[in-house]
């Protein structure tokens, strides 16, 4: 009931349009590549006789998105006396640390060895990006179109349907992102997939392996040598994906309610990310011509500290605040 009440009060707005919240407060949503529909939020507070207050909240931020053509920040925003609250998820990670090409290399290697490939994905953003990458591998004749690709996860399937809906304005050149030989999985098909060891690709939620159909596939394939489980995104400490990271071959692991021996190849790629890296975050801050203050949030303590030090080295500002620092 609360959700329905909330949704009935939601009003869609365009990017870069000022919204008057009160006579003295205006809000503007600014483009953000984190996910489809993501936005940075600029709050402008103006009272007669007082210095204007402008605060930009980046939220989860990325400077790019496979499915969007992002525009530059408007100059009217860049020239304001601005305080920025910025995320720091990858504030200590350099662009140079990203292993580009690892995903394709691992997938094609596993196909050559006729393995079953499990690709845990997040429902929104990562699912569609992985489907696009698999299509690109097919289009360049690197991935055999006869290899079946199964797509599991109700929420991921629902989000993917939205990408195909003209109401979501994604890049026209990316609208045809389905790989050939793609099958949407239901419960019946899922059971059949567990009964065969033939070469196939299974794209499944959840991204960290903790929820969704991944909790069905991983326990089954973790003990098989002819399987690759390739995590395509961030695995938070304590998540199932993170717990598998340090398990050696043949080591006993707990998977849901099962205790299994790990013989599958479990790998992790970092080339897909919905968060900007440290240099890209700095690049965003450098766009502002009159920075008043910077506050860092959303990151591990050591990451926030490292990013704060980088800001002080590279941005003309004397101090940086860290929110929720332990």
Segments (PLM) and residue ranges:
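His/Asp/Glu-rich metal-coordinating catalytic cores
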Residues: 1-129, 133-144, 148
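Short acidic-hydrophobic, aromatic-tinged amphipathic segments that line or gate anion-handling sites
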Residues: 8-16, 180-188, 321-322
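Active-site neighborhood of phospho(di)ester-bond hydrolases with catalytic His/Asp-centered motifs
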Residues: 29-33, 56-61, 85-89, 119-122, ...
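Short, solvent-exposed amphipathic alpha-helical segments in soluble enzyme
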Residues: 43-46, 72-76, 101-102, 133-139, ...
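Short, conserved loop/helix-junction motifs that constitute active-site signature segments
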Residues: 73-80, 143-144, 220-225, 286-290
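Hard-cation-handling environments
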Residues: 105-240, 297
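A short, acidic, amphipathic alpha-helical segment used as a generic capping/interface helix at domain edges
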Residues: 212-221, 273-289
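Generic long, charged, amphipathic alpha-helical segments
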Residues: 253-284
